[in-house]
Amino acid sequence: MATPIIVGATIAGIAYSSRFLIRVIQRAKSKQLFEMVSTPGFTVETIEDGFENKMTPAEAANILGLKEESTKEEIKIRHKLLMIKNHPDKGGSSYLATKINEARNVLSSKNSN
């Protein structure tokens, strides 16, 4: 009679401990990220001006986070990663998705010539 109670309590304890451990690990990871971002050597470059009427290769490279001389494969990979993060169907901005696509097209056409 006592065996099912002991087994149930043991399973509940293991589940609770696992949940607690997962939360501790997640907090530690977010704390490390916060410390990395708040260090003086970590800077984020921002652009004060908006987008140009016609996107330039320099602006396209800046949007994708690449160099203007990047290969088609690098452009393709970076475009895919940014679209996964910013796709409108996943809650991202359709404006940003449009700019990411335009940047890919500008860099791809520049590098094919």
Curated annotation (Swiss-Prot):
GO annotation terms (biological process): protein import into mitochondrial matrix; regulation of cardiolipin metabolic process
Which is an annotated Pfam family here?
A: DnaJ
Gene3D superfamilies linked:
DnaJ domain (1.10.287.110)
Q: Where is the J domain?
A: 59-113
**Mitochondrial intermembrane topological segments:** 1-4
Cellular component terms per the entry's GO annotation: inner mitochondrial membrane protein complex; matrix side of mitochondrial inner membrane; PAM complex, Tim23 associated import motor
Chief localization: mitochondrion
Q: Does the entry feature the keyword Transport, yes or no?
A: yes
Show the coiled coil region(s): none
Q: How does this chain sit within the bilayer?
A: Single-pass membrane protein
InterPro entries registered for this protein in UniProt: DnaJ_domain (IPR001623), J_dom_sf (IPR036869)
Enumerate the subcellular locations listed in this protein's record, separating them with semicolons.
Mitochondrion inner membrane
Is Aminoacyl-tRNA synthetase there in the keyword field? no
Q: Which PANTHER family match?
A: GEO10507P1-RELATED, PTHR12763
Family listed: Belongs to the TIM14 family.
Summarize subunit and interaction data from the UniProt record for this chain.
Answer: Interacts with PHB2; the interaction associates DNAJC19 with the prohibitin complex. Interacts with TIMM16/PAM16. May be a component of the PAM complex at least composed of a mitochondrial HSP70 protein, GRPEL1 or GRPEL2, TIMM44, TIMM16/PAM16 and TIMM14/DNAJC19.
Q: What is this protein called?
A: Mitochondrial import inner membrane translocase subunit TIM14
Organism of this sequence = Dictyostelium discoideum
Gene that encodes it: dnajc19
